[in-house]
């Protein structure tokens, strides 16, 4: 249930639309107050293009699961007398109407129909690269987190609740940050051997420098270890109860998709200019910086060119290549592997002779040896030190941050830096993915504990779990109905489906002070040392992750699911689990006090999406226990791949107008399969709920059937506006289709959508040829 802050002065908090709808009571077509009246009058005078009679549903009595209405249900959802006039229904109607453009024919472009006014009237703030249904909730959540973090916490309070406050204060101390200038990073860099570009000819005078030793020093100091070789502790894909060392291709500062194009790509040019300008701010000679950093950039381009593209990394079996230390040494002798790995592991952990190490992309390591052999040490060192200096810029004084903003503008279109308090809230609550495993969330666990205690209603867990079970049952029945699966594969799919663990809201352990105290025992933050404290957090997180190497994987570990204050949802192939944090169980996505068609169209869609991820092109590679295993009969797999190919080609043929770019059907196929399956499953689940509980009332001012409103809620889930630069990046590097195509692609494949809106066969939203995986 959405958190509602009680306020006796309720009327003053209503907007004009809500006041008008309330005063009008049962009147479906209302006239709003000045400023909004003409627009809404137009909306309310415009009948939907088709107004079919809804299917009669069983039962007309109000149950505890139904929203109370202003009039008794007559048992026919198309009856305009059934209107919900509660406070929450009026607010919901207002929100829906502000986004819709009902004069658009839904069978032509449902995204414009559901989100057209939102797209025309909403403006992207200068400090953002996009706005969306998600960002509205995230902004509200950010303000709630600010209140939590800025609250005074005396020394008597547990340390784990004071740590976020200390980091926030360090971040907000702009006076000290400006006074220090570049000193925080230059002091550390000098201790690490110095940036050759800055040190000049005195660098490496004894010719003893090696990139391996530099990586070890970076690890000790709290920087990333992944600039040459990505080193992490992961889960054994074929035995997900064990952990192992995972070696992968290097982490790049600019996406591979851009770097491989060289200077033909404008963003590569922007990146190069940024490198040079930042180096000059640190004291480098500009001409020398241009020369030396060009060589370093060419080295990074070479790293990109020997790396695998995302399209090739979707097959997990291709990324699973176990080697012993001896095999590594024989194949890639340019690194003393045992010494290298031991130096990166925490004290007390050492690589055994029979240790099985996963080499994600063997061809990368073969090519890397050749690249390193022909690249001068100074070029490699300049590149590595550029990376840590580039990482540090956001923690430094304003002259550095202004140049960073210019680069961000080229990259994503952002026009201004966000308010300092927003940045500091994010720093104090978010994980650093660059150096920490996914199950480490810096101070987000501490802040999340305070957040759920103050803002999350426990009833929301039960409501969401009920929907999960209903939608899971629908997927089970879909498996029964598909005619392209053999019986054995279908049985395994059902077993995987019903074994899928569900994590909703937050783990109870988050509220246990003893567990929190133990988790944060080794972490300290100095409010007068912002950058150093952040590096300390990185060391803490890396040690936490690496110390798990010899420990069995606990798939229900509370720490892995202790990220409640985010607006997102997750599926884990290795856990075979779905997760819905507290942050998404509110706002557009869920409210127990509004009609169910709105909840099924929003959070129900998300639930179905995450369940379906277990059976998308990547999730299907893992079995019921989360192990990488081929459990598909060859004929069934062939049929699946043909269906997935239809999705790939459908989305790959979409062209985004603003950028002129075609979508990447391969990289987005997993999300697209999940969208298509998720909305179908949730729709069927809603129809079953309605058959059991009877018809639901309409929302005031919205003369649509409950089924049509389900689709409106689903479409408005993806209302979003992007800056052109951000959209280009999303299409080029992302796994999600732009919002417009998430709606058009999935709903145009739905026969029920076409039926509910009476779309003629062959219309844009009811093509003759449809794609369907599940």
Swiss-Prot record:
Modification comment: N-glycosylated.
pH-activity relationship: Optimum pH is 7-7.5 at 35 degrees Celsius.
PROSITE patterns found in the cross-reference section: NEPRILYSIN (PS51885), ZINC_PROTEASE (PS00142)
GO molecular function: endopeptidase activity; metal ion binding; metalloendopeptidase activity; metallopeptidase activity
Keywords: Cell membrane, Disulfide bond, Glycoprotein, Hydrolase, Membrane, Metal-binding, Metalloprotease, Protease, Secreted, Signal-anchor, Transmembrane, Transmembrane helix, Zinc
Catalytic activity, as annotated: Preferential cleavage of polypeptides between hydrophobic residues, particularly with Phe or Tyr at P1'
Listed GO CC annotations: extracellular space; membrane; plasma membrane
Family matches, as PANTHER family: NEPRILYSIN-2 (PTHR11733:SF224), ZINC METALLOPROTEASE FAMILY M13 NEPRILYSIN-RELATED (PTHR11733)
Protein name (record): Neprilysin-2
Taxonomic placement: Eukaryota, Metazoa, Ecdysozoa, Arthropoda, Hexapoda
């Amino acid at each position: 249930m959405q958190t509602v802050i009680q306020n006796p002065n309720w009327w003053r908090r209503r907007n004009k639309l809500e006041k008008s709808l309330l005063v009008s009571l049962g009147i479906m077509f209302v006239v709003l107050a000045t400023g909004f009246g003409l627009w809404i009058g137009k909306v309310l005078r415009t009948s939907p293009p088709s107004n079919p009679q809804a299917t009669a549903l069983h039962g007309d009595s109000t149950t505890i699961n139904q929203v109370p209405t202003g009039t008794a249900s007559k048992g026919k959802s198309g009856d305009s007398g059934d209107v919900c006039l509660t406070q929450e229904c009026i607010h919901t109607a207002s929100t829906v109407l502000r986004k819709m453009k009902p004069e658009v024919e839904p069978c032509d472009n449902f995204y414009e129909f559901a989100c057209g006014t939102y797209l025309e009237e909403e403006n992207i703030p200068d400090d953002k690269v996009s706005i969306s249904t998600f960002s509205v909730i995230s902004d509200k959540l950010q303000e709630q987190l600010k209140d939590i973090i800025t609250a005074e916490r005396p020394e008597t309070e547990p340390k784990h609740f004071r740590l976020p406050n200390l980091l926030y204060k360090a971040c907000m101390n702009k006076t000290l940050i400006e006074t220090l200038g570049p000193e925080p990073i230059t002091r550390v860099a000098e201790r690490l051997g110095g940036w050759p570009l800055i040190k000049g000819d005195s660098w490496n005078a004894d010719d003893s420098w090696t990139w391996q030793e530099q990586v070890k020093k970076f690890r000790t100091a709290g920087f990333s270890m992944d600039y040459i070789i990505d080193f992490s502790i992961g889960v054994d894909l074929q035995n997900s109860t064990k952990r192992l060392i995972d070696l992968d291709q290097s982490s790049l500062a600019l996406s591979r998709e851009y770097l491989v194009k060289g200077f033909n790509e404008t963003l590569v040019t922007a990146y190069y200019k940024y490198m040079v300008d930042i180096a000059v701010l640190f004291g480098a000679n500009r001409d020398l910086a241009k020369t030396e950093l060009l060589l370093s950039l060419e080295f990074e381009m070479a790293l990109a060119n020997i790396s695998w593209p995302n399209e090739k990394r979707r097959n997990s079996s291709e990324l699973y290549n176990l080697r012993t230390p001896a095999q590594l040494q024989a194949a890639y002798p340019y690194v003393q592997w045992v010494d290298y790995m031991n130096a990166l592991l925490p004290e007390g952990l050492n690589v055994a002779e029979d240790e099985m190490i996963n080499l994600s992309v063997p061809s990368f390591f073969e090519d890397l040896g050749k690249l390193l052999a022909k690249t001068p040490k100074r070029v490699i060192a300049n590149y590595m030190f550029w990376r840590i200096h580039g990482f540090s810029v956001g923690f430094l004084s304003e002259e550095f941050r202004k140049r960073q903003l210019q680069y961000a503008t080229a990259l994503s279109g952002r026009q201004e830096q966000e308010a300092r308090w927003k940045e500091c809230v994010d720093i104090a609550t978010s994980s650093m993915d660059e150096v920490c495993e996914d199950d480490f969330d810096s101070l987000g666990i501490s802040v999340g504990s305070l957040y759920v205690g103050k803002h999350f209603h426990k009833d929301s867990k039960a409501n969401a779990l009920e929907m999960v079970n209903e939608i899971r049952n629908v997927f089970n029945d879909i498996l029964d109905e598909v005619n392209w699966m053999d019986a054995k594969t279908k049985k395994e799919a059902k077993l995987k489906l019903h074994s899928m663990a569900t994590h909703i809201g937050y783990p109870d352990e988050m509220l246990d002070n003893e567990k929190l105290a133990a988790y944060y025992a080794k972490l300290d933050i100095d409010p007068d040392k912002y950058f150093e404290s952040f590096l300390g957090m990185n060391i803490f997180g890396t040690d936490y992750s690496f110390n798990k190497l010899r420990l069995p994987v606990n798939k229900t570990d509370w720490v892995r699911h202790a990220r409640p204050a985010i607006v997102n949802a997750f599926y884990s192939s290795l856990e075979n689990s779905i997760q819905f944090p507290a942050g998404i169980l509110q706002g557009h996505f869920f409210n127990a006090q509004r009609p169910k068609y709105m909840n099924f169209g929003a959070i129900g869609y998300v639930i179905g999406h995450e369940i379906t991820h277990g059976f998308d092109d990547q999730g299907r590679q893992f079995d019921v226990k989360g192990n990488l295993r081929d459990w598909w009969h060859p004929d069934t797999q062939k049929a699946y791949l043909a269906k997935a190919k239809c999705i790939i080609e459908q989305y790959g043929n979409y062209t985004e107008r603003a950028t002129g770019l075609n979508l990447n059907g391969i990289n987005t196929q997993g999300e697209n399969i999940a969208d298509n399956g998720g909305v179908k499953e949730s729709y069927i689940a809603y129809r079953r709920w309605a058959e059991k509980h009877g018809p639901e009332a309409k929302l005031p001012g919205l003369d649509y059937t409950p089924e049509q409103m389900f689709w409106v809620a689903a479409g408005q889930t993806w209302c979003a506006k992007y800056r052109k630069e951000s959209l280009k990046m999303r299409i080029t590097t992302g796994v999600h289709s732009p919002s417009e195509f998430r709606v058009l692609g999935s709903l145009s494949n739905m026969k029920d959508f076409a039926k509910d809106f009476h779309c003629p066969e062959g219309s844009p939203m009811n093509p003759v040829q449809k794609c369907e995986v599940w």
